[in-house]
Amino acid sequence: GTTSIRYGVTRDKVVRMKVLLSDGSVAQIEGLKASEFKAKTEQDSLEGNIYKGIYKELSNKDIAKSINKEFPDPKIHRRNTGYAVDALLDMQPFREDGEAFNLGALLAGSEGTLALTMEITLQLDALPPTYAAMLVPHYHSLEDCLSDVAPVMIHPLFLCEMMDRVILDCTKNNLEQKENRFFVSGNPEALLMLE
């Protein structure tokens, strides 16, 4: 969400999940060492077939190379564009020194298209400070706004969100959103919300 620059993204916080698969079976998803992953592939079930399929595809060097080439750079913190298949390549058994394989990293961004989440255990973070300040610089051009993002990100922000003219115009005549525009001055091309 909006505070992911401080706390990370959901896929990094999934400890375990209880999910309903397409055949009606229930699967427990949690971190698996390479040997536990292998045991999952030997199960005669849809869950076993899922792990077999993942192993078959991601063990293929050409596929892994293509994923690493075509997917967004992992250094880009918020790169939520589709399924995070590339994150699985950094886990055991695909990387010997990788963290335990957790299919939850993939399921977290799938919006229910791969399995229905019944229960989820997340790693919690400390609460944010009691008081916060929001700075909202206004810009005459989208380019100026975008050029300020990298310099402001060196500061320990909790939130850095851009709103461009398109979004701002959508709120202008919306009765529900009009009152939320109290901080917008004039007709900026863009603004940054910095907490």
Feature roles, as predicted:
Residues 1-143:
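FAD-binding subdomain of flavoenzyme oxidoreductases
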Residues 37, 120-125, 146, 153-195:
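Terminal amphipathic helices with adjacent charged low-complexity linkers/tails
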Residues 83-86, 150, 192:
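Active-site-proximal helix/loop capping residues that flank conserved catalytic or ligand/cofactor
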Residues 108-109, 150-154:
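Short, intrinsically disordered, mixed-charge
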